[in-house]
Amino acid sequence: MGEHNLLNPGFVGPLVNIHTGDTFYFPNFRASGAQLPGLPSLSYPRRDNVCSLSWPSAEPCNGYPQPYLGSPVSLNPPFGRTCELARVEDGKGYYREPCAEGGGGGLKREERGRDPGAGPGAALLPLEPSGPPALGFKYDYAAGGGGGDGGGGAGPPHDPPSCQSLESDSSSSLLNEGNKGAGAGDPGSLVSPLNPGGGLSASGAPWYPINSRSRKKRKPYSKLQLAELEGEFLVNEFITRQRRRELSDRLNLSDQQVKIWFQNRRMKKKRLLLREQALSFF
């Protein structure tokens, strides 16, 4: 056993000039992990208090992150209760004046919404989770404001315009616009082509201004006029100016009417020839 083993790194290293791990770096340290007596020993005491944060004494520090909420919150609340974290403040809401019969409300709707204490009798209406009540709903204040209990028009389901201030804000502006448009101009200045006697239609909207030229009513040719024009066309497709004047005087037509009729008749003949040529190929 005293012979040198060829597989010993301490013996092979100097022979082949290869520095092994134990001979080059740590000559006093072996691969088995044993520590020689010459090396100093370092002691690492175990600390129980690992956390540096100051937690309450009732909760021991165990190395796990602490929750942010002080009180335990159920992740699956029952359906009958609403989550307390999602509750809105009790002071939030919109107010509406009860509007007494004798006194008129001086505040508008926007001012009443901003001021919670609008009046001593202000009633708090809680917010509904379904969204705004009158979303996409347009109320006709002109029809529902003056109707009272007679039911002039159907109001919004949550905020009917029962206050005098709402009536004065909305219906007066709409009614004034209609009266201003009706009384500004002369009723006779706006004439409808379908109803020349009346200036305005049933809905109150004007048809045409007086400056616009109405279209002349179409007057078809009589059989006698068509027969004379067809006979002249068979004689000469392109009528002269002198012959056109003679036809217009004899048939009680204008020169422009005779000219346009001959143009249309030539185009009709051309279409008939093209149709016959197309049918001849088949």
Swiss-Prot record:
One of its GO terms (molecular function) is sequence-specific double-stranded DNA binding. Residues 162-175 have a biased composition (Low complexity). Sequence-specific transcription factor which is part of a developmental regulatory system that provides cells with specific positional identities on the anterior-posterior axis. SUPFAM superfamilies: Homeodomain-like (SSF46689). SMART domains: HOX (SM00389). The keyword Transcription applies. Transmembrane segments: none annotated. Residues 214-273 bind DNA. It is found in: Nucleus. This is Homeobox protein Hox-C12. Keywords: Developmental protein, DNA-binding, Homeobox, Nucleus, Transcription, Transcription regulation. Its main location: nucleus. It comes from the Eukaryota. InterPro entries: HD, HD_metazoa, Homeobox_CS, Homeodomain-like_sf. Residues 94-129, 147-214 are annotated as: Disordered. The keyword DNA-binding applies. PROSITE patterns: HOMEOBOX_1, HOMEOBOX_2. GO terms for cellular component: nucleus. Belongs to the Abd-B homeobox family.
